């Protein structure tokens, strides 16, 4: 399949203004690069969101991106105009990828509910996390003993699951 890689710092977008205009008609009043990006995401079979953990949370760029999906939340939960069947959601997998410098076990804990909410808004099954902490001690991902093999294995697995659901595997 096709892979569409987007680096958020290269995308021109503004944060959500909290104006709630989208609660009336399901349309975001901000016209920038995110609306077409969200349209592309809704058509994807899999979505991997990647953000390092800084100060116990995802990056500001990622949070700003996720918050802009508020208009889709409004469509789903206020206006009830965005609906996908359970079968559709089962066939659309979301994965969170992250690293953290510290070795603390709970370093990713603040990110998980945010990802859960976003994948729900986008009608994706939050399938898995590919996470590795203790990067400072290992001096980067390449020296981490399990990060790359685990990422490859989990990446293959999500592709296999989607292929099987589509009858391709």
Residues of each region from the PLM?
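Beta-strand-loop-alpha "switch" segments that mediate conformational coupling across diverse proteins
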Residues: 128-134
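Active-site donor-binding loop signature of nucleotide-sugar glycosyltransferases
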Residues: 8, 99, 132
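Short, basic/glycine-rich phosphate-binding loops at helix/coil junctions
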Residues: 16-19, 95-96, 131
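N-terminal beta1-alpha1-beta2 submodule of the flavodoxin-like/Rossmannoid cofactor-binding fold
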Residues: 1-74, 135-169
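Short, glycine-/small-residue-rich phosphate/pyrophosphate-handling segment
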Residues: 74-127
């Amino acid at each position: 399949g096709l892979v569409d890689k987007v680096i958020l710092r290269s995308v021109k977008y503004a944060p959500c203004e909290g104006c709630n205009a989208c609660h009336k008609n399901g349309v975001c009043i901000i016209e920038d690069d995110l609306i077409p990006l969200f349209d592309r995401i809704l058509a994807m079979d899999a979505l991997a969101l990647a953000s390092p953990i800084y100060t116990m949370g995802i990056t500001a760029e990622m949070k700003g991106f996720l918050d802009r999906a508020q208009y889709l939340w409004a469509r789903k939960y206020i206006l009830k105009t965005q609906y996908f069947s359970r079968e559709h959601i089962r066939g659309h997998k979301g994965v969170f990828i992250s690293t953290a410098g510290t070795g603390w076990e709970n370093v990713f804990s603040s990110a998980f509910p945010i990802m859960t909410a976003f994948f729900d808004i986008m009608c994706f099954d939050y399938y898995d996390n590919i996470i590795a902490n203790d990067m400072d001690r290992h001096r980067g991902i390449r020296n981490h003993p399990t990060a790359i093999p685990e990422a490859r294995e989990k990446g293959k697995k999500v592709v296999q699951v989607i292929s099987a659901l589509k009858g391709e595997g």
